[in-house]
Design a protein with these regions (language model features):
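Conserved small helical "lid"/interfacial subdomain of P-loop NTPases
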Residues: 4-45
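Short acidic, glycine/proline-enriched loop segments that cap or flank alpha-helices
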Residues: 25-28, 43-49, 66, 88-92, ...
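The conserved phosphate-sensing helix
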Residues: 44-62, 69-71
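Terminal-proximal interaction/regulatory segments of ATP-powered molecular machines
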Residues: 109-189
Length: 189
């Protein structure tokens, strides 16, 4: 197998140039496109695999658009597409109750832990599942926050002490798209 080490941008460009000479006709990949592939991957601790992926997806996009060149725009589009696919894959991999919590946040965006919990309990009832305890759900919110899919901020509420409000950092479309194949959730998305 290929062992991927950390490369600098120049080395990544060399690797890409080899790939291009194997799989593209001459001059099909514009220089700025090649440079952006290398720069985007070089910034990510020199990941040659990421550069190769970017180039491949950019090439597919160019082909689909019947363009005879891979341009810097194709690379930008490819980069967004790869990010979206990563988000979708990580959302799909959550267990059911985490998904229910994410749907509760989606339905009550910008809500406090308490509001999210009651929204979650309602969703559990709708899909015929027993809800977890509020303490466990609060813990789950902190765990999901670490993944970057939701963001929370502490709000001070006078005599009631403080609560945390959470909102999604991904679009609700992305959540729906990622969960649509899960049978249990089909009625509530």
């Amino acid at each position: 197998g290929i062992v991927f080490t950390n490369y600098n941008v120049e080395q990544i460009k060399k690797i890409l140039e080899e790939r291009i000479s194997e799989s593209f006709i001459e001059n099909a990949v514009e220089d700025p496109a090649l440079n952006l592939c290398a720069a985007l991957a070089g910034g990510e601790h020199g990941d040659a695999r990421r550069a190769i992926d970017l180039l491949r997806v950019a090439g597919e996009l160019a082909e689909r658009q019947q363009s005879d060149k891979v341009t810097i725009e194709h690379v930008r589009e490819a980069s967004l597409k790869i990010e979206e696919n990563k988000e979708e894959a990580s959302l799909k991999s959550y267990p059911l109750h985490e998904k229910l919590v994410l749907l509760a946040i989606m339905k009550a965006n910008g809500s406090s832990t308490g509001e999210i919990y009651s929204s979650y309990k309602n969703l559990c009832k709708t899909v015929g599942k027993d809800g977890l305890t509020q303490r466990r759900v609060t813990q789950m919110l902190s765990e999901i926050e670490l993944s970057g899919i939701i963001s929370g901020r502490l709000i001070h509420q006078g005599i009631h002490g403080r609560t945390k409000k959470y909102k999604l950092t991904v679009s609700s479309e992305m959540i729906k798209k990622s969960f649509k194949d899960e049978l249990t959730l089909q009625d509530i998305i």
